[in-house]
Amino acid sequence: MRGTPLLLVSLFSLLQDGDCRLANAEEKLMDDLLNKTRYNNLIRPATSSSQLISIRLELSLSQLISVNEREQIMTTSIWLKQEWTDYRLAWNSSCYEGVNILRIPAKRVWLPDIVLYNNADGTYEVSVYTNVIVRSNGSIQWLPPAIYKSACKIEVKHFPFDQQNCTLKFRSWTYDHTEIDMVLKSPTAIMDDFTPSGEWDIVALPGRRTVNPQDPSYVDVTYDFIIKRKPLFYTINLIIPCVLITSLAILVFYLPSDCGEKMTLCISVLLALTFFLLLISKIVPPTSLDIPLIGKYLLFTMVLVTFSIVTTVCVLNVHHRSPSTHTMASWVKECFLHKLPTFLFMKRPGLEVSLVRVPHPSQLHLATADTAATSALGPTSPSNLYGSSMYFVNPVPAAPKSAVSSHTAGLPRDARLRSSGRFREDLQEALEGVSFIAQHLESDDRDQSVIEDWKFVAMVVDRLFLWVFVFVCILGTMGLFLPPLFQIHAPSKDS
C-alpha cells in the first residue's frame, strides 16, 4: 500500500516530462523551420524559377445568406480549402520527438494570395487568417472561413419562378500561370456543413478551371452556384392577390348599368394593380434587358382592366340611348336582339304591351264613337262595337232609340250623328282630347319599347365582353405561368 502513492507520483512525473519534451520539440521545430536565416515567407517555395507551384482548391459551402436581386449581390459563407507543398517546411519527425503536424500562423508562411475576383464590396481576401496545418513532408493545408459578397447577374425573365447562376471566381492576385497552377481538388463544392436557405434551393455547385489559350499567364478557378428560388412567398404575397384583384374586374360586367358603380370598380381595380406594379419595381433590379414574369402578368391584367373600362363606356353609351337621339339599325336588331342572345345563353322575357287603358267602371262610362252613334241612331254589329282601338269618356248616358230614330232615319251616318241634339261641341273637344292622349300614350309606349331594346342590346354587349374577358384572362394567365413551371433552365456559363 505504501508503494502505490510513489507509483502514481512516478507516472505523473513521466507524463509531465513527456509533455514538456513534446512542447519543447514543437517549440524547437517552430524555431528551426521559421528561422529567418533559412525561411522567408515572401519567397515562392520553388526550387527553380520555372517550377510551378500547384495549388489545390476545394470550396465548402456553409450558408447561402442572401441574394439581393436589386443590387445583384450574392452573400455566402464559405470555407476555401487550399493545399500546396513548401519544401522548406519539411522535417524529419524522428528528430523532433515524433512530431508530424505543426500549426503555424498563416501570416508567418508563404501564401498564394488567392482572392475573390468578382467581389462586390471591395473585400478581396479572407476576414480571418486561421493557422495553417503543416505536415512533416512539407504539405500545407489552409482552411480560412470567409463571408463573400460577389457580383451576380440576375435574370429576371422568370421571376419569381427563376433560376440563377451566380459565380465565385478565385485567382491569385500577384502570381500568374507561369508561377502557380490552380487545380480543383473535387469537381463540385462540398455541402457537408450546409445550412439550408429559406428562399433558395441549391441545384448544383460545379467547379471549373479556366485558362486562356491566347494568354498563357491566365488561370482561375470558378464555382457556379446554380440556385432556384422557392416561389411560395411571392405566390402568397403577390401572385394570388393579383389574380384575385383581376377577378374582381369580371364583376364589372355583372353590375347593372343603372347602378352607376361600374366605372368606379374598374378604376379601383386598375389602381390596385398599379400599386402592385410599383411594389415589384422595388424588388427586381432596374434592368431594361428583360421584363419579369410577374411584371408581364401585371401589365397584362392592367391592359385587360383598361379594356373593361373602354367596354364599360361603350355599354353605358348604348344603355342610355333613346329614339330621340339614335335610330336602331336593322342589323343591330338582327344581331343583338335575335342571334347573339342565343349563343350567349340569354333569353329576353316576353312583354305584352296593350295600348288600351280602361278606367274603373264605377267612375266613367266608356264607349267608342261607333257606340255613341249606335246609341243615337240604332243598333250595330258587335264587330263595329269593338273594332276601334280608341276609347273616350262619354259623360252623358245614351238616349233611347225611339227618341232619335224618327227624324234622323233618312240622313247619312255622320250627318245624323252631327244633327243629333246631344252631340255637343264639348263632347267633340273631349273626343279630340282623348284621341290626343291615346296617340301620346301609344307614342310613349313605342318609345319605351325602343328604349328597352337599347337596354337589352347593352346587356348583350356586356355579356359578350364578359366571355371575351374571361377567356382572354384564363388563357393569358396559363400562358404566362405554366411554361416557367415546367421549363428546365440550362445553367449559363461565362465565356
Swiss-Prot record:
List GO terms (cellular component aspect): acetylcholine-gated channel complex; cholinergic synapse; neuron projection; plasma membrane; postsynaptic specialization membrane; protein-containing complex; synapse
Site note Key residue that facilitates effective access of the conotoxin BuIA to the channel binding site applies to 81
Transmembrane feature ranges: 236-256, 265-285, 298-318, 464-484
Give binding positions for Na(+): 261
Q: In which tissues is it expressed?
A: In the brain, it is detected in the medial habenula. In the peripheral nervous system, it is found at least in the adrenal gland.
Q: Which CDD domains match?
A: LGIC_TM_nAChR
Per UniProt, subcellular location reads as:
Synaptic cell membrane; Cell membrane
- Reply yes or no: does the keyword Electron transport apply: no
Task: Pinpoint the site Key residue for a low dissociation (K(off)) from the conotoxin BuIA.
Answer: 133, 141
* Cysteine pairings via disulfide bonds: 152-166
Q: What does this protein do?
A: Component of neuronal acetylcholine receptors (nAChRs) that function as pentameric, ligand-gated cation channels with high calcium permeability among other activities. nAChRs are excitatory neurotrasnmitter receptors formed by a collection of nAChR subunits known to mediate synaptic transmission in the nervous system and the neuromuscular junction. Each nAchR subunit confers differential attributes to channel properties, including activation, deactivation and desensitization kinetics, pH sensitivity, cation permeability, and binding to allosteric modulators.
Which NCBIfam families does the record match to this protein? LIC (TIGR00860)
The family this protein is said to belong to: Belongs to the ligand-gated ion channel (TC 1.A.9) family. Acetylcholine receptor (TC 1.A.9.1) subfamily. Beta-4/CHRNB4 sub-subfamily.
Self-association and partners: Neuronal AChR is composed of two different types of subunits: alpha and beta. CHRNB4/Beta-4 subunit can be combined to CHRNA2/alpha-2, CHRNA3/alpha-3 or CHRNA4/alpha-4, CHRNA5/alpha-5 and CHRNB3/beta-3 to give rise to functional receptors. Forms stoichiometries such as (CHRNA3)2:(CHRNB4)3 or (CHRNA3:CHRNB4)2:CHRNB3. Interacts with RIC3; which is required for proper folding and assembly. Interacts with LYPD6.
Question: What protein name does the entry list?
Answer: Neuronal acetylcholine receptor subunit beta-4
Which organism does this record belong to?
A: Rattus norvegicus (Rat)
